[in-house]
Amino acid sequence: MELKTMYFDTNNTMYLKVVSKKFVDKLNEGYNYLDDEYKIATLDITDDLFYKCSDDCVRECFNNDSSAHLRMRKTANELVSFTDYKNVFGQLRKDSVFVLQVFPKFDDPEFQMQEITDGNHGTIYKANRFYLGEKFDLGDVEVVKFFIKKGTDIHLHYDSIQRWAFDNRKTEVSMYLFGFSFVRGLDNFKVLAKICRDGNLELLRLLELNGFNETIKLYAIILSYISFQPLLTNYLLTKSYNFQKSNITVSNWKATMPYGTIDQYKTKVLLMAIANNHAELVQYLLTQNPSDKDINHAMLYAVTTANASLLDYTLKNGGNIHYKNDQALILAVRFNHISMVRKLICLGMDSNNVFALTMAAENNHQDIVQHLINRGADVNANNRSALIAAVKNGHLKIVQMFVNNGADIKIDDTVIKTACKNGHNNIVKYLLGKGVSCDDIVLPSNSSFFSIVKLAVKRSIIVNNDKSNKIK
């Protein structure tokens, strides 16, 4: 493979920029296809956001420089970062998709360029004037091979490129990278977890060839099982001495583990079991001398799944009901588990939790809102944030709950203005009927918000005819 070189500047220096698909899509919005080969446009960019140029700009660019692919100009003195062949893999992020050629425009009188050394990612360059050339797909193993051939430091950035390949399910790239001799230092469990998540049998076999010991093999069985990957599970069972295909259970797996090895990856397995909703495995791991963190993770899992018995078990064994700033109550509200909300409050959690009340109001969880109010939640706390959330999202019944329990809707025009702004005419009608004045709403006469209220008045939506409700 050979990358095209374009001679845009006297120095003929090429760099590389790793970009996401979103970045390229923004570029494509500005592309104007004049023929099959050249994409010509002049773009101004700010913070990596690209704006489509006019046809006049395109014609001017085409007439002045018919060899250009894409010319980019940075607004003001802002700089765009890029790198070189050696460090290109150090710039990878999970959403990276392409590598673009970058040619600094050294002959531009406003050209600026910086060079920054980063111990983790290698050398980074920044410039405000440059051309972009070809784009190359990182998922193409031939592109990866080419970069390595051109001097990419695979030893320094191996973890970065291999992690990217796993996260983006680029099997061919992963298999090629496994061929390097220094791979034996890789975290086998981390790689194994990703393989089991994806159900990739090819990579599982390749991992075996690169140091798949008996302990890792046994973990692989349970990880494939809790990841719902029967193809991998059945493959691993054919290589295990202690499992029967028809009887994959936690106790069976436990019996096969060499003494002491269960603790090695216990927390990681626990988190995977929680993520995949395997209550049996969660409960078993909690009997294996769990750390405080393990117990609290399991407690939060019990709340999100409304598992009362598991919640009781975790609390009995040291779980902290207030872990991570009362996350248990927040999760119970988020997942609309009224039974968990009741239980947690009975266990001593503060019902006057503004964030919990606001979240319940925002998501129209009426039973939870009523229960929190009944247990003493302040409906006017934090500048009436819960009330405003209900109004903003158009939840009339919850607004009525708040008003019936003392919410202050007349202290200023925030509540009715929010209802107007979001077009909730039923709430506007209700508020006006409750005596909220619209005289003091400070909005321009041509405002759509103002028009909504005016329309409400014209159509006799107001329940009472108090002068304070009229708009002149």
UniProtKB/Swiss-Prot annotation:
InterPro entries: Ankyrin_rpt, Ankyrin_rpt-contain_sf
SMART domains: ANK
ANK repeat windows: 125-156, 187-216, 265-295, 297-323, 325-351, 352-381, 382-411, 413-440
Protein name: Putative ankyrin repeat protein L675
UniProt keyword list: ANK repeat, Repeat
